[in-house]
């Protein structure tokens, strides 16, 4: 017998499977819609989408014991590197119809894959843009509560800082998935993460850092706050 209970983070759920194993899930904002072939559970008249940590760095962070999760129902999120919307679809479930996601993606081909998803998920606003040039989408994005960044570039810390200066409310939060090999392949991941933390701390208060192994190799997730 499958059972669903609330996670400590609002909008996130825990599915207890027949074998007793636990998986995280979100309540489907668009019942009947699958985004990336994920498993769907029906429980007490609601539909829940299993959040696969192997396909989502944010999902991996929650499974790995993330302590600070500023994405909540009703919040506005600037998502840098939204890609085809795997993680963003779960964020969409969490923020709900009262919230919104501005999804920045550099690749027109990848953004096209998002179109059928956002036709029904009206709380996702896809924007073709370059996250290294936040001024490019100034006319389309308002101040937000949270910025989530998943952009594999050497300057990824600077990208978060520049976007936070333009779009993050005071007291708002940033979350960034850092891939050490994208920054410097010659250095040990731990050294890269320390350098990123130092760079982030020049502008933000760094609240948490979490390793994403075994789901993502040489990745860490940072949670920061804008003073």
Curated annotation (Swiss-Prot):
InterPro entries in the record: Fibrillarin, Fibrillarin_CS, SAM-dependent_MTases_sf
Domain of life: Archaea
Coiled-coil ranges from the UniProt annotation: none
Enzyme class, broadest EC rank: transferase
GO terms under biological process: box C/D sno(s)RNA 3'-end processing; tRNA processing
Transmembrane segments: none
GO molecular function: histone H2AQ104 methyltransferase activity; RNA binding; rRNA methyltransferase activity
Alphabetical list of CDD domains matching this protein: AdoMet_MTases (cd02440)
EC number assigned by the record: 2.1.1.-
Keywords: Methyltransferase, RNA-binding, rRNA processing, Transferase, tRNA processing
Pfam families the record matches: Fibrillarin
Binding site for S-adenosyl-L-methionine: 86-87, 105-106, 130-131, 150-153
Protein task: Involved in pre-rRNA and tRNA processing. Utilizes the methyl donor S-adenosyl-L-methionine to catalyze the site-specific 2'-hydroxyl methylation of ribose moieties in rRNA and tRNA. Site specificity is provided by a guide RNA that base pairs with the substrate. Methylation occurs at a characteristic distance from the sequence involved in base pairing with the guide RNA.
Family: Belongs to the methyltransferase superfamily. Fibrillarin family.
Xref: NCBIfam families: PRK04266.1-2, PRK04266.1-3
Quaternary structure note: Interacts with nop5. Component of box C/D small ribonucleoprotein (sRNP) particles that contain rpl7ae, FlpA and nop5, plus a guide RNA. These sRNP particles form homodimers, giving rise to an asymmetric holoenzyme.
Protein name (record): Fibrillarin-like rRNA/tRNA 2'-O-methyltransferase
């Amino acid at each position: 017998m499958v059972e669903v209970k609330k996670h400590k983070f609002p909008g996130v759920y825990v599915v207890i499977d027949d074998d007793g194993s636990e998986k995280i899930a979100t309540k489907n904002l668009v019942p009947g819609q699958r985004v990336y072939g994920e498993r769907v559970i029906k429980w007490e008249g609601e539909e829940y989408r299993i959040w696969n940590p192997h396909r989502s760095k944010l999902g991996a962070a929650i499974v790995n014991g993330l302590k600070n999760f500023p994405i909540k129902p009703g919040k506005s999120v600037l998502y840098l590197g939204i890609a085809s919307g795997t993680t963003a679809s779960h964020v969409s479930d969490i923020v709900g119809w009262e919230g919104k996601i501005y999804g920045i993606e550099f690749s027109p081909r990848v953004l096209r894959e998002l179109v059928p998803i956002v036709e029904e998920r009206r709380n996702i606003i896809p924007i073709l843009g370059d996250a290294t040039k936040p001024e490019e989408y100034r006319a389309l994005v308002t101040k937000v509560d949270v910025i989530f960044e998943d952009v594999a570039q050497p300057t990824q810390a600077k990208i978060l800082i520049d976007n936070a200066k333009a779009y993050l409310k005071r007291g708002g939060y940033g979350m960034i998935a850092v891939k050490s090999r994208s920054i410097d392949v010659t250095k040990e991941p731990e050294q890269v993460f320390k350098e990123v933390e130092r760079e982030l701390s020049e502008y933000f208060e760094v609240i948490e850092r979490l390793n994403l192994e075994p789901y993502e190799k040489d990745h860490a997730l940072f949670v920061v706050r804008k003073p």
